[in-house]
Amino acid sequence: DLIDPADPHDPIARQFLPDAAELDARPEETADPIGDDVHSPLAGLVHRYPDRVLLLVTNFCSVYCRYCTRARMVGSVGERSIRKHDLEKAIDYIAGNPVIRDVLLSGGDPLSLDDERLEWILARLRAIPHVEFIRIGSKQPVVQPQRITPALTRILKRYHPLWMSLHFTHPDELTPEVAEACARLADAGIPLMAQTVLLKGVNDDVETLEQLMRALVAARVKPYYL
């Protein structure tokens, strides 16, 4: 547990614990802040750009980030992942659109799925000839590094080219256990990139960001965007 309960400004806690300041928000900031719905032809699929799609494979995460752009759906009551029927329809949509070459698995956190369901999704996508790249967006290696098991890395290796975007926010998250999980993924030939959200009171100073970026590079994770 990285959270210091005695520190009201703990940078890890501020990512996940509610703050009264969140109540000061406009409706458009909470309903669909990045406009996914207008680009969603099917349940669980966002087709915003011609050659790539976002495939939402689950509603669940190991933690619930206060800044999540899909907070309206993440953690909602229902099945752990979208219904298999909906997922099959979304994959059929991808198969029927040859212009799509890049599929990003998101949600929720795809690595919160069990190995069997995750591999079923990867196998279905890899069987589509025009899908060149599969990406997985996840915070699981950061908050639950024990999820990155030898069995999981063996599964992921079967579906190259496969990339992972990991969600890092503060240098305190780069524990030895997290670095080991990243090493397992990197050793499996998976390019690792970091997505970082700029958060007031968490990482909005040069020193913290420098520490984070240097720690990421040392863990074989390329800082991708801030």
Segment roles from a protein language model:
Residues 55-56, 68, 103-105, 109-111, ...:
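Conserved catalytic-core segments centered on acid/base and nucleophilic motifs
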Residues 59, 69-72, 107, 138, ...:
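Short, structured patches in soluble enzyme cores that scaffold and shape functional sites
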Residues 78-88:
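Short cysteine/histidine-rich metal-coordination sites, predominantly Zn2+-binding motifs
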Residues 1-48:
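Flexible, acidic/Gly-rich N-terminal and inter-domain linker regions that tether
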Residues 87-102, 111-226:
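Conserved AdoMet/S-adenosylmethionine-binding subsite of the radical SAM
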Residues 44, 78-79, 95:
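Domain-level signature for proteins that mediate thiol-based redox and metal-cofactor handling
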Residues 68-80:
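Iron-sulfur (Fe-S) cluster-binding segments and ferredoxin-like electron-carrier domains
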